Amino acid sequence: PGVLPVPNEEALRLTALTGYLLHCELPGHVEFDRKNYFYPDVAKNYQLTQLAHPSTLHGYVDFEMKGEPMRVRITRAHLEEDVGKSFHFGRQSGVDFNRGGVPLLEIVSEPDITSADMAHAYLNALKDILVYGKISDCDMEKGMVRCDVNISVRPKGSSTLGAKVEIKNMNSFSGVRRALQYETPRQLEAIRNGETIHQETRRWDDVAGITESMRTKEDAHDYRYFPCPDLVPFEPSKEWFEQVQQGVVELPLDRKKRFMDQYQLPDGAAEAVSDTLLTLQTKRIV
């Protein structure tokens, strides 16, 4: 009676295409895992994700910040299922499960971002890649893209990062920048006062301009990951990868550099033309 579930083929294709756009490695063997935890946004108490064998690994995003070339490495871009959306009002909370189970592409970056402005520039560059590559419209107001930020500080001269603090509930890229501009000094001041920074999850209050503690942050072993028994490993063929790769487009920064080389355009003009083409592309997608 009944049938076992199968992965969403279009979600797998878009994840692989994202991997190509972000210069990632694409393994030929992909597995799904169950991430077990007890929290109201997951009614079944586990979330389908990819831990040991994700869809993509080891990429990077190149972008410019105040005319200087920057690069943020990508740890992985993997597929998982979305969870419910939590609402907090007064002393009560609620959960909207309408988006629960919908395929979600999570892009994880390496700790290469060193300032709030760099985080803002990186997010805009990543958004341009995803929009121009026809992965997503990336409309934050419609919940098409969300961002969680992990912040760690370290003493001067030390290469060891401190405890990781995750910040949620940021509804815009400018909100991400404001949250970083608040949280980083908060942690530094706490260390100067002899306090200990604990690994935790905090919530950004955009109206008050502060972060508030939500819960302690779990380590990976606390989730008790194990392979999903219902989903068989995905091992795409060489032809499948070649078909996905046909969807790779010229990235905005590469296009800008080509305009400068091919048409001898100055930096500002090349960027303006590139941005105009990106806007036209976005309108066609919408």
Locations of regions flagged by a protein language model:
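Basic, nucleic-acid-interacting segments
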Residues: P1-E250, D267
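Long, charged low-complexity interaction segments
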Residues: E250-V273
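Conserved small/polar residues in nucleotide/adenosyl-binding loops
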Residues: T276-T282
